[in-house]
A protein has these predicted regions:
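Bacterial Sec-dependent N-terminal signal peptides
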Residues: 1-23
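Carbohydrate-interacting regions of secretory-pathway proteins
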Residues: 21-198
Length: 198
């Protein structure tokens, strides 16, 4: 089992090096006008578009919501500008399913900012992103980039590498989601959402 994990790690590292050499082309996944290209939740009251900005805002019942891409991805990179606007922001980027994500904002369980850290159902936060407090700009626009190659995840925050993690419970193919966490009052904004396939 240990040999299998080491072998997987070496393969992922090799793929990663090749990926950086090729610089995958990022294409816009958000047109700034409407939610075309995304699966809009039924009775949507959470997601809106105005002046080129995608806003996630809690509803009165604090139900929460996920906005999924209408396309599925295997190995990919996603990059987006984001801003924490109001309330206790707890959001994130789901990676092919709703069991693995890159946290953005305040963790509901830890009650502190865990931006850039992976949240894995059953493992919670197996690692924590580094130097986020020094890098993150409160109440301003920031940029996050997430790379997912099989179960290998890497995160950059404002062009600074903050996290690497390999998951053994990843899903091979699926959509990418933006989360509005339930049981919180919050507003968060996204713009310039771009996705590239590996």
């Amino acid at each position: 089992m240990k040999a299998k994990i080491i072998c997987t790690f070496l393969i992922v590292n090799f793929i990663t090096l090749n990926m950086f050499a090729q610089d995958p082309v990022l294409k816009s996944a958000f047109n700034g006008k409407n939610l075309k290209g995304w699966v809009v939740p039924e009775n949507n009251i959470w997601w809106s578009v105005e002046n080129g900005i995608l806003r996630a805002k809690s509803g009165p019942d604090k139900k929460g919501s996920i906005l999924w891409t209408d396309k599925e991805y295997t190995d990919f990179v996603i990059e987006t500008d984001f801003r924490y606007d109001e309330g206790t922001v707890d959001t994130g980027i789901f990676l092919r399913n709703d069991k693995e994500q890159i946290q953005m904002g305040i963790s509901g369980s830890l009650k502190r900012d865990m931006t850039g850290s992976p949240y894995i159902v059953g493992k919670k936060y197996p690692v924590e992103a580094q130097n986020v407090k020094e890098i993150l700009k409160p109440n301003d626009w920031n940029t996050i980039k997430v790379i997912a190659i099989a179960g290998y995840y890497e995160v950059w925050l404002n062009n600074k590498h903050v996290m690497s993690y390999t998951s053994d419970s990843y899903v091979k193919t699926g959509p990418i989601g933006l989360q509005l966490h339930p049981n919180t009052e919050m507003t968060a904004s996204f713009r310039n959402i771009k996705i590239g396939k590996m």
